[in-house]
Amino acid sequence: MMPSTGILMAGRVVVEEAPDVLNPEALRQRLNTNDCGAVVSFVGLTRETEGAADVLRLEFDAWQDRLTPVLERLALEAIKRFGVLSVAMAHRTGSVGPQEPIVAIHVGSPHRKEAFQACEWLIDELKKQAPIWKKEVTTDGETWNCLLYTSPSPRD
């Protein structure tokens, strides 16, 4: 895994782009859990099928200069919005095979409710705002899914 390019707020935010491999547990170990009573995690995996077709792989491309700043901004917004204490998140780029992790999000919080809310919000916003594009390669052919990234935020 690539070293973190963003550690903010005295270690409260860890953001990574993972071009070769994503180890969700190693990322979770980097989450600052001081004063936390809950850690909520989400790990997205490549499905084995899409409709009737077998998935051979997903290929993710990212706007390299913008990915880390967008993820950092989302993590900071989650801390502010939900009152959680820390966020660690990473997204794969490159080729990802079936059942391999694509994205990992870990949220540390004094209480579980806020951690669950923040984690759900983070994956939803990541899919809307992160400059990442996905090509699905299946036994039926190849399809680009450009709906992962809709538009840059005016703050970016």
Language-model-detected regions and their locations in the chain:
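Short proline/glycine- and acidic-rich turn/helix-capping motifs at secondary-structure junctions
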Residues: 135-145
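Mid-chain, well-packed structural core segment of small domains
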Residues: 82-113
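Well-ordered alpha/beta subsegment
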Residues: 110, 119-121, 135
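A common structural junction motif
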Residues: 123-131
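Compact, glycine-rich, soluble single-domain proteins
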Residues: 55-93
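Short, charge-patterned binding micro-sites
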Residues: 44-52, 93-97
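N-terminal small/polar-rich segments of proteins
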Residues: 3-41, 45-47
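Conserved small/polar residues in nucleotide/adenosyl-binding loops
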Residues: 149-156
